[in-house]
Amino acid sequence: MTSNEKEMGKSELLVVTGMSGAGKSLVIQSLEDMGFFCVDNLPPVLLPKFVELMAQGNPSLQKVAIAIDLRGKELFKSLVKEIDIIKSRNDVILDVMFLEAKTEKIISRYKESRRAHPLNEQGQRSLIDAINEEREHLSEIRSIANYVIDTTKLKPKELKQRISKFYLDENFETFTINVTSFGFKHGIQMDADLVFDVRFLPNPYYVEELRPFTGLDEPVYNYVMKWKETQIFFDKLTDLLKFMIPGYKKEGKSQLVIAIGCTGGQHRSVALAKRLAEYLNEIFEYNVYVHHRDAHIESGER
């Protein structure tokens, strides 16, 4: 939502959807704490009627978040159509947030909660089959989402913090860049738009006194950044991003996720993600956030 649209008093509608077990309930709870009027599991066919209520100017409906999932089954099929209808209006700003997680993580969460998956309420099939079917059903709505968040590696507190950064930031409407470091041995960053592999750089893991630390610590950071290869890579990377990022924004993208990966996600990727976020903050007026997904893992890089 832009500053001009805020001045015009347009209402905000956020549709929260995605995989069952990916964290929709937690996101809705967080948004409610931030002053959103929240509705859980509204049938998609009722979305236009709800927007009509919002358009009447009720102050309590100025910022609304609606969670929609496959519990509606057949009704869910109309969601993309209803969203297109709402986007054609000029009095309500609509965003779509899609939450997902790796299949094995969703299985783990369901085992912990002991709840039935919405596509397997009778227990007549395997959980993995239900998850795969749901992922297929959701592919279309995922493709039109403004924000895609992979919660596989996020603790509940970290997910809440990410939502808070989005919606408590006065400049959120401009453009958001998320820079993430990760370790390939722990899995690729699933929600990344751009992935850069820095495993070709000298590895601090093999310097015994540096091994226990991360790229956020000065000795490791200095070690990673001192090499000629690092400087050449960083210069080429920033030249590329200076060219690409304005194009993403021009095409209407509101969030860009840049992931930098090394082997374990503790040293090289952390140092470069830190430096890249600082650089992007210096040259752009966009919101730039940095997250180190695997830096806390004590085993380090291999």
UniProtKB/Swiss-Prot annotation:
The molecular function GO annotations come to: ATP binding; GTP binding
Q: Which domain of life is it from?
A: Bacteria
**Does Nucleotide-binding show up as a keyword for this record?**
yes
Instruction: Give binding positions for GTP.
Output: 69-72
Matching entries from InterPro entries are given as: P-loop_NTPase (IPR027417), RapZ-like (IPR005337), RapZ-like_N (IPR053930), RapZ_C (IPR053931)
Which residues does the record give as ATP binding sites? 18-25
Provide the alphabetized UniProt keywords: ATP-binding, GTP-binding, Nucleotide-binding
Q: Name one Pfam family in it.
A: PapZ_C
4Fe-4S: present as a keyword of the record? no
The record's section on PANTHER family has: RNASE ADAPTER PROTEIN RAPZ
Q: What does this protein do?
A: Displays ATPase and GTPase activities.
Which family is it part of?
Belongs to the RapZ-like family.
Q: Could you identify this protein by its name?
A: Nucleotide-binding protein SE_0548
